[in-house]
């Protein structure tokens, strides 16, 4: 005789955030941020294109840097796209990234089937087969924007209110002066060497 134990598994309710009401701003000429925004990417038939500098959703032919559709992300750079963007994944905390690396940025590409993809974003989340929820991994993406500037961002959440998937919350910093500096310069700790300088 076999004994079967049936347990109750409850699905956790992830935090949910409503899409940020975005008002365009002037393009920063220096380091701007960190700024936290939630983008509505629930539609599976169109991309939500985000302009990091202007902190707004790009319409029509307006320039954009990052596009999201459900859990898919791409940058505005690569064959068939109008920008020079690329992205690099770093397995380090957002606050620790103070300068963008000089190279290694992966562009997006259009597949033979017409989909736009960027392999650098593959695996940005963990998927639970028990709860069927996506949880962002603790990684930072460094972005070369559509016009060659630099930014960094980390994905914080993927859910809208009511556990509805597709509201991508991210924190980002944008550098408007053309340099690769993405955070405050960290000062060196004071020396404990008591010898006079030679």
Task: Cite the ranges covered by each PLM segment.
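Surface-exposed, beta-sheet-biased, low-hydrophobicity segments with strongly acidic/polar composition
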Residues: 1-198
């Amino acid at each position: 005789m076999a004994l079967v134990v049936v347990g109750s598994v409850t699905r956790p309710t992830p935090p949910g955030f409503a899409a940020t009401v975005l008002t365009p701003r002037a393009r920063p000429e220096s380091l701007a941020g960190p700024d936290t925004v939630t983008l509505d990417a629930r539609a599976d038939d169109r991309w939500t294109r985000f302009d990091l500098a202007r902190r707004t959703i790009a319409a029509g032919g307006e320039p954009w840097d990052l596009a999201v559709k459900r859990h898919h992300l791409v940058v505005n750079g690569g064959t068939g796209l109008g920008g020079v963007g690329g992205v690099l994944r770093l397995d380090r905390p957002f606050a620790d990234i103070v300068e963008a690396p000089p190279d290694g940025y992966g562009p997006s590409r259009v597949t033979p089937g017409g989909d736009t993809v960027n392999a650098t974003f593959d695996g940005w989340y963990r998927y639970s087969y028990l709860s069927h929820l996506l949880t962002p991994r603790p990684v930072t993406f460094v972005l070369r924007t559509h016009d060659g500037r630099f930014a960094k961002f980390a994905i914080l959440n993927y859910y809208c209110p009511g556990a509805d998937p597709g509201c991508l919350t991210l924190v980002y910093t944008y550098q408007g002066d053309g340099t690769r500096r993405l955070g405050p310069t960290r000062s060196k700790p004071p020396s404990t060497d008591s010898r006079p300088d030679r």
